[in-house]
């Protein structure tokens, strides 16, 4: 595959995001809908796919102590700046939160279980009329903008008649045409200058981690760091990762560099690699190459599991990605990277997702621990063999199988998780 296609996919899948991306996506949608209509808000209706609804259900809104779909939508309309994309709530003020709290009776949330992939629609009714937006497939991918039933913007190639996926989604799916040896060959041989941009994720996510070490969220990262000696890069990796996620899910007004639409995925696929780099005094080039591998494996799995799923994509998909990156950074061969992925597939695949919330750092810690264990096993010639569980004869089929566990495998599980969450909130 042309290396420029791979690089473009990496660039497209990587972007800054403030807070968990599902409430950010809802806020962006309502911000754009209000932007085109203006006036005094009478009602906001949000229609979302079940996965997006679940992930935003109990997640903190950046810069506030508020949580959930309703507040995300209201704040998007009240103070959101759609030009900032997933950082649309960057300018939030206390008075905006106070205003939103008085308007909770003006919002309706509907779950649309018939959509395929990520979907959020915002219909904002004001004294000036109705503004409407639809976001599809990616958290910031606005495909339709209407004002009083007149189309102001409609994205071309939004639907592909053969499979109902956007052209952008099809581009990322090209990753799944690659064999693992081709992926590793790209990582080894691509010009460093062409992938140096990946280090931007390190700078952004490290700042978020430092914020989390102040004791945000459940304080897991801070707790782990307290027991970490100077040369223990594994515990340091857990601490960096968990503190960044602690900060993110608790509403810290500090962005993460997302990948495959998720800040948590972006954190897990990068910060453990930074921990190794720092403790072993490695150079930036090998770090960038390991991040490229981590990202690509994560993207590969997510193309089969979906952007949002019943399993914890952070621990499973991103965890598998970073396990490959860890093995690479520790000098692993192609075969050892392959065996690392097999070990991950055999371990925590199937860990459930209960949405973006304070438990995310706990699951992330499990994912990072499993990633290091899988790599260490592979580097010591310990591997789960083919035809054992979901490990297939080819590593590509094994990665596909990881995704299949989520979709279609756990679709009914996802529905039940959402039912439990809704019942528990009453």
UniProtKB/Swiss-Prot annotation:
InterPro entries referenced in this protein's UniProt entry, alphabetically: Ser_deHydtase-like_asu, UPF0597
One GO molecular-function entry: L-cysteine desulfhydrase activity
GO terms (BP aspect): L-cysteine catabolic process to pyruvate
Family, per entry: Belongs to the UPF0597 family.
UniProt-recorded name of the protein: UPF0597 protein CLK_1197
Organism: Clostridium botulinum (strain Loch Maree / Type A3)
Upper classification of the organism: Bacteria, Bacillati, Bacillota, Clostridia, Eubacteriales
């Amino acid at each position: 595959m042309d290396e420029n296609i791979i690089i473009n996919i990496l660039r497209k899948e990587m972007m800054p995001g403030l807070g968990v991306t599902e409430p950010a996506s809802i806020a962006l949608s309502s911000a754009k809908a209000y932007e085109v209509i203006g006036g005094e808000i009478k009602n906001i209706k949000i229609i979302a796919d079940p996965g997006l609804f679940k992930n935003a259900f109990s997640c903190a809104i950046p810069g506030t102590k508020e949580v959930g779909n309703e507040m995300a939508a209201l704040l998007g309309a009240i103070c959101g700046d759609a030009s900032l994309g997933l950082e649309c709530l960057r300018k939030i003020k206390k008075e905006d939160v106070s205003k939103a709290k008085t308007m909770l009776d003006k919002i309706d949330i509907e779950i649309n279980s018939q959509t395929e992939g990520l979907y959020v629609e915002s219909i904002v009714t004001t004294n000036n009329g109705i503004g409407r937006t639809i976001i599809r497939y990616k958290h910031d991918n606005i495909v339709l903008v209407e004002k009083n039933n007149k189309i102001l913007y409609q994205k071309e190639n939004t639907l592909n008649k053969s499979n109902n996926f956007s052209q952008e989604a099809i581009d990322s799916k090209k990753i799944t045409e690659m064999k693992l040896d081709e992926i590793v060959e790209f990582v080894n041989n691509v010009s460093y200058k062409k992938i140096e941009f990946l280090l931007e994720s390190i700078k952004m996510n490290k700042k978020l981690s430092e914020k989390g070490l102040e004791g945000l969220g459940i304080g897991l990262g801070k707790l782990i760091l307290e027991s970490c000696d100077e040369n223990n890069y594994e515990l340091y990796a857990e601490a960096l990762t968990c503190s960044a996620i602690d900060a993110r899910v608790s509403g810290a007004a500090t962005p993460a560099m997302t990948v495959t639409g998720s800040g948590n995925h972006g954190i897990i696929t990068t910060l453990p690699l930074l921990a190794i780099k720092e403790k072993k005094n490695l150079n930036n080039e090998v770090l960038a190459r390991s991040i490229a591998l981590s990202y690509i494996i994560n993207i590969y799995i997510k193309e089969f599991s979906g952007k949002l799923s019943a399993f914890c994509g952070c621990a499973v998909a991103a965890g598998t990605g970073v396990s490959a990156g860890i093995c690479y950074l520790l000098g692993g061969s192609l075969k050892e990277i392959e065996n690392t992925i097999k070990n991950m597939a055999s371990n925590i695949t199937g860990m459930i997702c209960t949405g973006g919330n304070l438990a995310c750092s706990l699951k992330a810690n499990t994912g990072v621990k499993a990633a290091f264990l899988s790599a260490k096993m592979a580097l010591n010639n310990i591997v789960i063999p083919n035809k054992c569980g979901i490990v297939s004869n080819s590593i590509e089929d094994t990665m596909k199988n990881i995704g299949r566990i989520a979709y279609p495998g756990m679709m009914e599980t996802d529905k039940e998780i959402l039912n439990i969450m809704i019942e528990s909130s009453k």
